[in-house]
């Protein structure tokens, strides 16, 4: 896919994701205003919008007219809630997120905690309401996202990650962290988009596995950038992993092995998408670019 065509499609998907976020979530002045202002502050902070884009693109790959806006917004709500909570002093204690003060710095810790709490049920309300006319689809989307965001994946990965190096530096534990903390929430968007696009069960699984491989690769790139980029590039403090005693792939296996694993995982993700019967050209290009990003 040539660069101009990719950029045009990517920009279009970003715009669709941003519009959905603005129109499908409560306004900042909804009572209680401070809570909703904190929610909107974090939702509208920008970022890559990677999860919504993956979901929208996957749906369109199988059915160009598919409407995945509610699912895309639900995914960003879950992702944003996890970032708000990750930044709290009791977790990563990060003052900067997406290039501006973290939610608890812009408001206060209690409001940030509650804003994250509120985004979680909002995500599932979006799935229930947005696909009410397709109850089986709604059920499957809720199940997919709940599993990805639950105690064995997203929250479980964060729990293990909080233990840092002190909890033991073994490869199995690291894989659990990578799969849970990052990969699960890149696997779910592709699977959910495929479900909305009425893909076959085989293709839904290909998308799920592609997201899993791409998600682990995404985290490994993040780990490398944490040691080499600057705060302006990343939009968050650099060197935080080392500072917080975090357990990372480069720390365990070294930089050359990390770079090789990124290439292997990216190829695996592309192969899964190539096996799908939908038009996954854009998704394959996006995942390839994710592996070589500098922010």
PLM-predicted stretches and their roles:
Residues 1-26:
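N-terminal amphipathic/basic leader segments beginning at the initiator methionine
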Residues 278:
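Short phosphate-binding/catalytic loops that engage adenosine nucleotides
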Residues 5, 9, 42, 174-177, ...:
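Non-transmembrane, amphipathic alpha-helical segments
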Residues 25, 29-270, 281-291:
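Mg2+-dependent prenyl diphosphate-binding active-site environment of isoprenoid biosynthetic enzymes
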Residues 294-295:
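Short cytosolic juxtamembrane segments of multi-pass membrane proteins
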